[in-house]
């Protein structure tokens, strides 16, 4: 059974601010989760052009996070089978990620994201069919809330109480009850997650586990977007691209893959039209 769920994450940012925040948080959280044995290896990061998405940046990454897998899954899957590969096409305000696992060749997870300057009440922003809408679940995530489930523990939990936090640089916060309907600026990340694990006996259980993991990741990363606002506020996309380039090199060096570190990042000037990749 294919799971389809749309997560709506309302943020107290403008669309322009959120783009910077997300880039910064992804970079920092990848650094925090990468050690000499596990973490994120960046295979490639380069410009792309696509008829549907326009221009953006394509990235290919390998996630070696075997220790974060549920115990029940590790009982019948080897550590190498739990390595996953992500391809992502970021043409902000539209993004798409496709995640596959070589150890489970039929498994596929896609995350389609559309960002809008609203407070989470837009319907069917992804243009789903009637059949897809009937199967889709919708959940609005409140970043001022906290979670204590298994996946929140695995992903990590911020100790910052956003109901009390106030940004020193912007004066924003705290996020009190009803903040999503009152704050300005405001925007929403509409994340449509589709998971298909067509394996008899454990496929449904793994689909549910992965969806719970995605929810925990969305909550924690977006809580960090606001909790770390004084770190990223004022940065430009050009500054962030340079920081990303340095971070990607550092990640690959941490994992002992200097060759990947040297070749992973390609600038627009270095990218030929023939080498650009379209969205899958």
Indicate residue ranges for each PLM-predicted region.
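Eukaryotic helix-grip
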Residues: 1-280
């Amino acid at each position: 059974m294919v799971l389809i769920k749309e997560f709506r994450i309302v943020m107290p940012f403008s669309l322009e601010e959120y783009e910077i925040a997300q880039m910064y948080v992804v970079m920092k959280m990848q650094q925090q989760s990468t050690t000499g044995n596990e973490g994120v290896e960046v295979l490639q990061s380069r410009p792309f052009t696509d008829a549907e998405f326009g221009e953006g940046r394509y990235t290919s990454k390998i996630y070696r996070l075997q220790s974060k897998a549920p115990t029940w899954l590790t009982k019948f899957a080897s550590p190498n089978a739990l390595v996953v590969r992500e391809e992502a096409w970021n043409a902000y305000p539209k993004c798409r990620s496709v995640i596959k696992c070589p150890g489970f060749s039929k498994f596929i997870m896609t995350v389609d994201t559309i960002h809008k300057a609203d407070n989470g009440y837009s319907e069917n922003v992804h243009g789903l069919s009637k059949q897809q809408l009937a199967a889709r679940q919708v959940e609005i995530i409140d970043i001022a809330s906290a979670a204590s489930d298994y996946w929140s523990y695995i992903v990590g939990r911020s100790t910052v109480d956003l109901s009390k936090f106030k940004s020193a640089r912007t004066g924003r916060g705290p996020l009190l009850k009803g903040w999503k309907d009152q704050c300005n600026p405001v925007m929403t990340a509409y994340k449509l997650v589709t998971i298909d694990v067509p394996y008899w006996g454990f496929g449904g259980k793994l689909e549910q586990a992965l969806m719970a993991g995605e929810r925990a990741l969305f909550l924690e990363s977006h809580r960090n977007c606001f909790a770390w606002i004084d770190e990223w506020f004022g940065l430009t996309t050009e500054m962030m691209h340079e920081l990303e380039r340095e971070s990607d090199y550092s990640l690959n060096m941490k994992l002992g893959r200097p060759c990947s570190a040297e070749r992973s990042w390609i600038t627009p000037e270095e990218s030929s039209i023939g080498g650009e990749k379209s969205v899958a």
